[in-house]
Amino acid sequence: MWRLRRAAVACEVCQSLVKHSSGIKGSLPLQKLHLVSRSIYHSHHPTLKLQRPQLRTSFQQFSSLTNLPLRKLKFSPIKYGYQPRRNFWPARLATRLLKLRYLILGSAVGGGYTAKKTFDQWKDMIPDLSEYKWIVPDIVWEIDEYIDFEKIRKALPSSEDLVKLAPDFDKIVESLSLLKDFFTSGSPEETAFRATDRGSESDKHFRKVSDKEKIDQLQEELLHTQLKYQRILERLEKENKELRKLVLQKDDKGIHHRKLKKSLIDMYSEVLDVLSDYDASYNTQDHLPRVVVVGDQSAGKTSVLEMIAQARIFPRGSGEMMTRSPVKVTLSEGPHHVALFKDSSREFDLTKEEDLAALRHEIELRMRKNVKEGCTVSPETISLNVKGPGLQRMVLVDLPGVINTVTSGMAPDTKETIFSISKAYMQNPNAIILCIQDGSVDAERSIVTDLVSQMDPHGRRTIFVLTKVDLAEKNVASPSRIQQIIEGKLFPMKALGYFAVVTGKGNSSESIEAIREYEEEFFQNSKLLKTSMLKAHQVTTRNLSLAVSDCFWKMVRESVEQQADSFKATRFNLETEWKNNYPRLRELDRNELFEKAKNEILDEVISLSQVTPKHWEEILQQSLWERVSTHVIENIYLPAAQTMNSGTFNTTVDIKLKQWTDKQLPNKAVEVAWETLQEEFSRFMTEPKGKEHDDIFDKLKEAVKEESIKRHKWNDFAEDSLRVIQHNALEDRSISDKQQWDAAIYFMEEALQARLKDTENAIENMVGPDWKKRWLYWKNRTQEQCVHNETKNELEKMLKCNEEHPAYLASDEITTVRKNLESRGVEVDPSLIKDTWHQVYRRHFLKTALNHCNLCRRGFYYYQRHFVDSELECNDVVLFWRIQRMLAITANTLRQQLTNTEVRRLEKNVKEVLEDFAEDGEKKIKLLTGKRVQLAEDLKKVREIQEKLDAFIEALHQEK
């Protein structure tokens, strides 16, 4: 039935559409036109004219996916105008788009539902963590109550402030463009840019002036840093030298090391180095020849020496003092032009400007290092070897320039120090004095000539050198004045020879070759030579070098054997003195004695590890109890014992033990352990070893012990671990057997007996001697002691009446005692009564506690069975057992820390201290003293000098 009805309704709809619609004749398919907007073509229409039917329809839209409704449709009369077939494509496109939005909407709704369902499934899979909410601290949930986030937000800079702090990129781009224009040739902005730059030149000038001080300060700091690392480098080089010596001395089987043959001048230089150390140590002066270069400041001493060495090796400055300590330069012939220091293996290639600059810088650093705080110059010598082709073999010493006035920045004694250094070198009767005089200044301003004439009045070992002759020829009006100087007629001094040299034009960057060429050219064209005022052999540094070398070797051959004989006699005297004073001892110098002492000290430190654990624990436990016994008795036991019942006693004890463990006990235990380690270490270090003990090491051992103890620090985590262990030990109240019970009673009796003895002594000092001592030793009581005695007797009567009297006197009791004493004619102060009562009651309490302790000997059975007996409560025994057990456990823990960690750390500190002392020569001289040490040092030095002199003399004879 319903199908018939549906068909009837469909027919009615069709008939209505046919009746009221007019279509377009053609082949347009009806299913592609919209229900409302399309015109329907009908084959039975009488005309082909388009009409606008009055069609009524509902607002419901239908698509191809929906069925037509079964109810009757009501069409509204809509009139359609004529539209061509080609203009219907927008309607078709709109229809399709309207269909598409339903697809998208449906997909979105379905996808959202699916996503929500998936999210719910995942949420169900996550476990419920609400029951673990207690793990998070409450402060996290209440953080907004403690922290004002709004206040923090206001304190932070705003976005506008941050924008202000950002760089101005427009200015940066503008600056870069200006810079680009500056480097671009021919740019129109170049002129303007440079004009702006000229305008800022004045500001830059002031900035440079202000920055100059900073640069000087930075250079000074850099110099100090270089000196610091120079010391480290010297120490490493010294260690390397010693190791190399050990390797060379090692005699492997079947291996023969080749012995290098040294040159004659090198052997002589080594002799002078050893003699220099010997002279500085014993304040003496050897008589071996050397060329001493002296002169006024800025007279050209260093330049002459550089011309002889054929290299600019010294630091120089315009008018300021640069030579601050003597520099010994050993010149020898070799294939390569190199320089090296005595205590360093680095070679400086003098043909390279980089190495020359490094050498000058190194010499300046060594000079500054030699100069002590508050001084300007130093007498310590810097030893430098220079080798090269064509160099004359000799040894020269460049001394600081002689000055007439001490300027600001110099030490007050600078002038006297320079004179003393110069005299010390020139007073050697075999020293060749190379006197340098500036020819460009007036002869009357010379200082050094007077000094030289004093040291060598006959001129038998002086060579006079006139520098800057080119300037003198230009400035001096009378050339004959130069002739008078060279002939020795102007200065009040005599010399072996007179020379005139030119050492440059005053430019420090000139090379040696350029200076030599200039010197030769000058003398070839000089009027002084042309007019025979100067002789040819008296000019140029080449002739000077040859003359000085010949004179030097002549003096060496004449004096070296005499010096060797004198050192042989000195050696014989020292050896005889040693045999007479120390016949059974080896000749050990200071370094060898230090090595011997070092081995002994390390052996004694190792002995600490051989101490038995039992000994460690005994001394630790005893020392710890001595440290804490007063606190245990006075602050824990006595206050708790004043309580009326055992519950209050235990509560008081637990509280006080907890406070003590948390604050004081671990620190006290570590202090005791550290002091015990020091005592044992000192005992091993100072314990005499019998007849083999050498007291010469006592000062060194004491210094090593003190320094090692000062450097040693206990492990920082020891207190934390001890606190836990001690707290657990004091918490244990269970005594397991009768032996522990008896040990606790014995420990308690010892502690109380010691306190009782101290109390008896205090009362005796308070009341004076008793009748026995008064009769036997003729001692009497003072008036104050008599008052204390009467007060004590009165208080003892009160205690006998009430043996369970509390620890403190009431005010009425004090009044009663005072009135009783006044009735007997004794005036007493209430404070005196309280002081006397404290000692009397303390003695009474300790005696009562000892009696109670004796009763508790048989109380272990009651304690073990937990019997409640008010007459026999032994809580104080349990307290002392807890203290005793804590002491034993603490001693065991500290012993483990000592043997496992601290002893090894102390041994490491001792090794470090010994290494530091080994590098400090002054420390060894201070700690290893005595006639025996000094005699061995002298003997070693003299033997070394004599052996080197003999080797040099032998080589000198072979060369002849």
Swiss-Prot record:
Changing residue 671 to A: In interface mutant 1b; strongly decreased ability to mediate mitochondrial fusion. Pfam families: Dynamin_N, OPA1_C. It is an enzyme of class 3 (hydrolase). Residues 501-504 are annotated as: G5 motif. Highly expressed in retina. Also expressed in brain, testis, heart and skeletal muscle. Low levels of all isoforms expressed in a variety of tissues. The record marks 194-195 as: Cleavage at site S1. The modification N6-acetyllysine is found at residue 228. Dynamin-related GTPase that is essential for normal mitochondrial morphology by mediating fusion of the mitochondrial inner membranes, regulating cristae morphology and maintaining respiratory chain function. Exists in two forms: the transmembrane, long form (Dynamin-like GTPase OPA1, long form; L-OPA1), which is tethered to the inner mitochondrial membrane, and the short soluble form (Dynamin-like GTPase OPA1, short form; S-OPA1), which results from proteolytic cleavage and localizes in the intermembrane space. This is Dynamin-like GTPase OPA1, mitochondrial. It comes from Homo sapiens (Human). The lineage of its organism: Eukaryota, Metazoa, Chordata, Craniata, Vertebrata. The gene is OPA1.
